[in-house]
Amino acid sequence: MSYQQQQCKQPCQPPPVCPTPKCPEPCPPPKCPEPCPPPKCPQPCPPQQCQQKYPPVTPSPPCQSKYPPKSK
């Protein structure tokens, strides 16, 4: 028997079945970047004069302008 014949006698092995590729694990959620430090507050404005802080109260308009007369 030649060497080739002996080899042929061995039952052929079926080709190895490739296992179905496993889905890669989902990516971990991206790490949030560290939140920005709160912006530094600018120095508070010097206190304004009262007049600017509290504007003068405007007198309420007369009733006529509030409720115009109905057009006939």
UniProtKB/Swiss-Prot annotation:
Q: Where in the cell is it found?
A: Secreted; Secreted, Extracellular space; Cytoplasmic vesicle, Secretory vesicle
Question: What UniProt keywords apply to this chain's record, in alphabetical order?
Answer: Antibiotic, Antimicrobial, Cytoplasmic vesicle, Disulfide bond, Lipid-binding, Repeat, Secreted
The identity of this protein, by name, is Small proline-rich protein 2A
What does its record list under induction? During squamous differentiation of epidermal keratinocytes.
Organism listed in the record: Homo sapiens (Human)
**UniProt region (Disordered), positions on chain:** 1-20, 42-72
Low complexity composition bias: residue spans: 1-11
Q: Name one GO cellular component term.
A: extracellular region
Q: What does this protein do?
A: Gut bactericidal protein that selectively kills Gram-positive bacteria by binding to negatively charged lipids on bacterial membranes, leading to bacterial membrane permeabilization and disruption. Specifically binds lipids bearing negatively charged headgroups, such as phosphatidic acid, phosphatidylserine (PS), cardiolipin (CL), and phosphatidylinositol phosphates, but not to zwitterionic or neutral lipids. Induced by type-2 cytokines in response to helminth infection and is required to protect against helminth-induced bacterial invasion of intestinal tissue.
User: Which family, according to the similarity comment?
Assistant: Belongs to the cornifin (SPRR) family.
List residue spans for each sequence repeat. Answer: 21-29, 30-38, 39-47
Q: Which Gene Ontology terms cover its molecular function? A: lipid binding
Query: Which InterPro entries does this entry report, sorted A to Z?
Result: SPRR2 (IPR029142)
Source domain of life: Eukaryota
Q: Kindly provide the PTM information from the record.
A: Forms five pairs of intrachain disulfide bonds.
